[in-house]
């Protein structure tokens, strides 16, 4: 609850949807949320809760080939 209130208190951050996106907007277009988030997570700027799921989704590329597809299938739709 405290985290949510802090985000609301920061209008600049809230407008950008997330502090991570704010930093990413320079490298990636803010319109592309998916690419922006992925780029952010790769650099490690995104402090939002989504990054927790992304690291798992970035690993699977190899697993998606045919191993542990069930686990990745659940995470993929989230993105």
Swiss-Prot record:
Domain of life: Eukaryota
Lineage, uppermost ranks: Eukaryota, Metazoa, Chordata, Craniata, Vertebrata
Start-end of Polar residues biased regions: 67-79
Residue span of region Disordered: 51-79
Entry protein name: Putative uncharacterized protein LOC401522
């Amino acid at each position: 609850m405290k985290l949510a209130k802090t985000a609301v208190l920061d209008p600049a951050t809230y407008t950008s949807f997330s502090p991570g996106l704010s930093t990413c907007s320079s490298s990636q277009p803010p319109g592309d949320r998916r690419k922006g988030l992925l780029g952010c997570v790769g650099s490690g700027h995104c402090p939002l809760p989504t990054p927790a799921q992304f690291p798992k989704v970035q690993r699977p590329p190899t697993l998606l080939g045919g191993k542990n597809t069930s686990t990745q299938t659940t995470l993929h739709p989230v993105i």
